[in-house]
């Protein structure tokens, strides 16, 4: 092989790796490491000129224009030595690949490179491996090759690519700062307290929950299961009433369609997973789409509030690289001149501006009479300009808002859409001769349309489509209607003027007027227009009460949904049947008695508003309806289907109407406040099929591979109403979880005393649902309630072994000073009989199964506020309050320094404490070894925080043992490694959707900052003073007692069994809580990424994971009792006391260690004998069975013979 050809191949690979560095493509992860460098065709590559030493290659012309790439090329020419980097205080860590190159020849290597960018889109390599033809196809690196969650880990300027002189392979080097932020020197500035920073997808209530400390005088006993507990199977929300629904919209971004926009500009600094608006979030059906070049989905104005929501959504999904996401610095300033002042005054000014803008727009619409075509065009132009002006004003309000500012309420948003829908009812006679079909750019594919929010009912999206479609079609109808006869036009324009000039308040006043005249005018649309006016007023969720007939008489399940089995009735004369149905519904309403049932329509509206706030450009189906009707030569009022308004038999049944491919279904949803059915008029079969497919893709399509970029922070500004109940009509429990560490997603009322609860999975994941924390209000005393949490994922739990959940009563805390206590009777944890459990073909049945925790509770107070949780909560705010107290303490602050370790993906501070006795003698400080203790890497394991609190209380106290420990050691305490997960209420993962306790081998600092900096801190401590012990605190959900996991030293005879001395001493000091028999010291392959094993591999013998049970103890005097916060804190103190005994150099303590060592040997020998006996017993049992079978077989043979 010619030398020049080898150099050419090396240059091409260098350029490839340099290009892929922006997508976190380090050398060790690159699949091209498996390929032997071989020459390419001269026409395919541009030969790079080798340097004199052959140690670096120049970039080709494709990246010569990029300044960043030029800088990387210059740094690459500096050589392979790590100490030649020009910046002072920085070092390079060489990441050399250890994979062996596969021998063979490469037939073809094609690099398809976009002319406007240096990003590699597709790489296909054909080569031979073990005399076999192989083909390697590498996908789009920029869209996240390294995993399903990471799209931008290592930035471009953090990789330096050189060429190895010996192997001629490109070597990626990661630049790291020499002065690690983990251990700042000579910095005495205090850490300030920070408000929790939420992902922008999450809604946050303005309420800080503070609980009083409380420990029961007598340990609470474990529950005694009888085995006869009731096991109700999940009924599902379709057979109940959704009384709470909150599911944060995921911030993951979906892979791009193959067709890209021509105006999309890409660069090395862009985030491909979140910059593109159409690709980051599926197109929306909820808002009209204003296309580029003046094209519109439908003629008419785009609602100003919809523009505001879209602008908010664009900000929320963009991956901002700025660390300071401050929305509150600028003062609010509009044309009204509001600037400065308090947040309350600004909020009033904002509301006033919105109200004035709305009145002005309505007044202009009332003044302009659309008699002629020019006047109508002027009216539409004025409305469009006014809408754009409002949108800009609202956008300015959003930019300059304050913390007290709340955007427009759902009532304001839905009233706009409700007004558009009522125009659809007025314009009944349609001529489609001049209907302009939508352009090609409007036909956006729905292939990747997925629901951005888990809606409480599948019919919500279809209902939203129906609303938008009717509004979209009506705008076209209003234009075409102007070409009719003059007499008909005058009558139509008169009714149109009356309807458009009346405001929302006037509509509400007119609704209670002559009902007979409304029934007579149904054919012209006036009656239904008034009905829908009242309906749009009710969509606000009961914020304002309006005097409308039947406001509390019918179930909202019946009003919004209707009966699926009866909503598909076909008819030939649609208009006549609609008149008949309307009159029948009027009569049925007048005859039906008033019924008070819980509301569900506001939950539907809330979810629809959430989808509206997140959706963009999803109303494509509404544009296709006009074209289909034109092609078929039919209108809405000529031929179609209608459905009879029927009454739902069960008040708790929540049926859905589905769009069928086989039937002509009406898409103009005309829902009445008084009726319990749904009036539908049809379109063509093609239109129905299109809508069906899009609805299915919106609700049921498979999610493409999601890629996590980075979550914006601050919490959702647009607050939707998660509580659908109307206090006057709903008398059940009120649920809430939009506070710190809360994770309830949905509450469904099956009966007045039975509720099914659904937990939200860890953010950006679909599993990990075990932790729960929620609030209940409006309780009734001496009434037995049953709660069933129906979507848990662990196959076993301590709930089947006597464990109980915890509760906190607000009135109990005030009257009796009670805090968190155990609660619940008839507790049972069992597997659901779902489809995955009954399917024998699925190999992953166990992984896909869900489990239910059910228990009963009887409240002691009326109208109480009660919190329920899996274990005693300990939030990020609780930790900060505690740390600030230490920092402000006059004595503790002298030997306890609070520092900032790093910031998380959401920008939350990760703190660490350095606790040691100050000394002026540097030699004494160097002799001190360090103790590293961390906690809460898993957000749901709150007992770890209580143990850490007990440890910090003891080590900062004034006892003799604490003083001796501070003089002997340097304590490095990281009390909360995963604050992001704690804040949002995750069970196990961080915002990356990954378990941080499996990422201790990571080199990606930006993705796992707390883990990376903790490991860097440990490495530095090992070099400076040494680490005597490392301990990571956790909690366990399947075992009782407290125990330790360690790492055995089989291959080192000198250290064999030494790692077990400290756990045995801890058992001696806390015999009724800590179990040495439960301790394990094995190293499993699945745990190689944990902190315990990674630190042990760094040379730390005493590397432990301490596990505290969520349940209780089975030892000594505490046998059969629950653990409480005092028990966990006691274990933290016992840890410190045992540490001093373990490291004491007193001869008596040394002799004690020798005795303990012998005792450990005896224990392990006994365990081996017992294990051997068990194996022999099993073999004997199997042998006996075989012997019995042989005896039976022989006896049968004898009898036969």
Swiss-Prot record:
Where Zn(2+) binds, per the record, is at: 938, 941, 1034
Protein name listed in UniProt = Cytosolic carboxypeptidase Nna1
Compositional bias per record (Basic residues), positions renumbered to this chain: 478-491
Cofactor(s) it depends on? Zn(2+)
Effect of inactivating the gene: Semilethal phenotype: females survive, while males die. Most male flies die between the late second instar larval stage and early pupal stage. Mutant males that survive to produce pupal cases initiate morphogenesis but die before head eversion. Almost all male flies that survive past head eversion do complete morphogenesis, and then eclose as 'escaper' males. Escapers display a range of phenotypes that mirror the disease pathology observed in pcd mice, including retinal degeneration.
Query: What is the top EC class of this enzyme, as a single word?
Result: hydrolase
SUPFAM superfamilies reported for this sequence: Zn-dependent exopeptidases
